[in-house]
Design a protein with these regions (language model features):
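Long, low-complexity, intrinsically disordered N-terminal extensions of eukaryotic proteins, enriched
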Residues: 6, 17-20
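Detector for the c-type heme attachment site
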Residues: 148-155
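Bacterial N-terminal signal peptides
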Residues: 2-13
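Low-complexity, intrinsically disordered/propeptide-like segments
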Residues: 11-16, 53
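Extracytoplasmic c-type cytochrome modules immediately beyond a signal peptide or single-pass transmembrane anchor
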Residues: 19-144, 156-196
Length: 196
């Protein structure tokens, strides 16, 4: 089983993972390759959708599409790849995107490393949960200028976007970001058949 998580404003970071667990086990290497591919493909699909909708109808239309279609893309992607997908962020918009304890620790670490200018483009480790081994992979997502219209300082968000946010996400926590902040992460959890 794979859990993939995406956040809006996707950015493919190419920095090598200096703090990632390194291994030569072929099973782990295959899982890591899969996780990277999943992250890139899923992130690229959602990013393309958002940019296309921004060009067609502006940020309000992109937000409407994102709130409805991005989750569908994720579910469809899961069905095709055989994985379970969701989004996580410390400051989430959709309550479905609350991180699990592992993801929360890593997102907090990403925030700290980002402030220290030491954030890598990915993180992975093998963990044991309920007696099973998993590869946990996370790719931080950094706020880009295009993200600010929906995720930036609340007072600068356009009125039509604010209205949609209030209607669809009354408990929205995903505002007041600045360009360069960690918005969330794409996270992939892959079951490993043998114990590590």
């Amino acid at each position: 089983m794979v859990v993939v998580t995406i956040a809006l404003c996707l950015l493919n970071l190419a920095a090598p993972p200096p703090f990632a667990e390194q291994t030569k086990d072929p099973e782990i290497e295959r899982a890591l390759t899969d996780a990277r591919q999943i992250s890139d493909e899923l992130g690229g699909s959602v990013r393309s959708l958002l940019l296309r909708e921004i060009e067609k109808g502006g940020f309000a239309d992109a937000l409407r599409i994102c709130s409805e279609v991005a989750q569908e893309i994720t579910l469809r992607f899961n069905e095709q790849k055989g994985h379970h997908t969701r989004r996580v962020s410390l400051r989430y918009r959709n309550p479905k995107n609350v991180p699990d304890p592992f993801e929360q620790r890593k997102l907090e670490e990403f925030d700290r490393l980002n402030r220290e200018r030491k954030l890598a483009g990915e993180y992975f480790e093998v963990v044991t949960e309920e007696g099973h081994s998993y590869l946990r992979y996370m790719k931080p997502l950094i706020v880009q200028p295009v993200c600010i219209a929906c995720h930036g300082p609340r007072e600068n968000i356009p009125a039509e976007v604010k209205l949609i946010l209030q209607q669809k996400y009354p408990d929205d926590r995903a505002t007041d970001f600045l360009v360069g902040d960690v918005r969330g992460a794409i996270t992939v959890k892959i079951y490993l058949p043998k114990s590590f």
